[in-house]
Amino acid sequence: MGDLKSLMPKKLGFGCMRLPVIGEDTAKIDDKAFCEMVDKYLEQGFCYFDTAYPYHNEQSEEAVKRCIVNRYPREQFFLADKMPVWNVKKTEDYDRIFEEQKRRCGVSYFDFYLLHAMDKARVEETERLGGFERLAERRKAGEIKHLGFSFHDSADVLEEILSNHPELEFVQLQINYYDWDSESVQSRKCYETAVRHNVPVIVMEPVKGGTLANLIGKPEKILKKLDDKATPASFAIRFAASLDNVMLVLSGMSDMEQLLDNTSYMREFQPLNEEEKDAIVRVVDELHKIPTIPCTKCRYCVEGCPKKIVIPSVFDAYNFSVQFGVNEKTRKGYENAVQEHGKASDCIHCGKCESQCPQHLEIRKLLEDVAKTFEDGTPDK
């Protein structure tokens, strides 16, 4: 544990899943803006970039090559990538995809490499196809420096994986103060499981897809009373980074403003003090009183939707209406979300989205709520 943690000069990683884009097309990454963010991030002593095969409609890895790999010495940064296990149908696919990722990123090795979004079913399939052994061979060959996995399942399943696969050096977990005691996400239980196995943790979704960066009302006031200059996001990221077994916290930064804010308090990181911890407990109590949809905007649900509903955008509009009321502005937000895509009422209840959701949301039922709010109707069943 100590060795991996000591590799990180600072505890903030740059997640490349919500990069600046041109217009509304997530596949059209704004290279100029991304390069400027990369430069500012690296010049402050940060060095960890996290990408993955599906991010930005499979364009994130190529953007990493253009804006980082082609512009900086390889030893100046750590690069993490992930095996999209859902795309693996036969053993040879591990090699094919890995080679494709090296080509996309323009590298000969990855500093950190993860099996992506593992759960019980995917672990069993990876074992059946020999995926753990295949990637261990890549590590032995020097093409992977450190091998781990990102995880979306129960603490019991995590216990099973770590017991059966001691060759895995780290785990990437969803940890934020809202989900800390959640029975569905099980952030605390999963973290404590990793601690028992002496496996260091990389944190994803510390701001819960932006939810904890946009507090209003009483939750916002509680934090402002502590420090009226600190952003809500700063408390969320510092909460995760304050955990002893956390080696790194990822933030999917979309613009320079977010990057400058995050780096300002993570440059010389200070763990939360007791007063701040108590305040966060009160914030969570208040948040649980607001019935928003806890979507993290990972977009795993979008690709397979037969009605082309952009579910995260639809949920965003709904959450905004819960917080600010149904008015011209919130209705416009919903109209923009469905302008070139399916409406909430177009849902045919096939359930494909729910099988892909790491948050285990009842998406079909939630789409009914959205339709009632914005369309004065309910989805056809």
Regions found by a protein language model. Name each.
Residues 1-77, 134, 140:
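N-terminal binding-site loop/beta-alpha segment at the start of enzyme catalytic domains
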Residues 323-350, 376-381:
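Short Fe-S-cluster ligation motifs
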Residues 292-308, 343-360:
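Local cysteine-cluster metal-coordination motifs and their immediate loop/turn environment
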Residues 118-296, 300-309, 313-316, 326-332, ...:
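Beta/alpha (TIM)-barrel catalytic core signal, keyed to glycine-rich beta->alpha loops juxtaposed to Asp/Glu
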Residues 4-8, 43, 65-76, 99-108, ...:
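Acidic (Asp/Glu)-rich catalytic clusters
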Residues 103-122:
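Active-site groove signature of glycoside hydrolases
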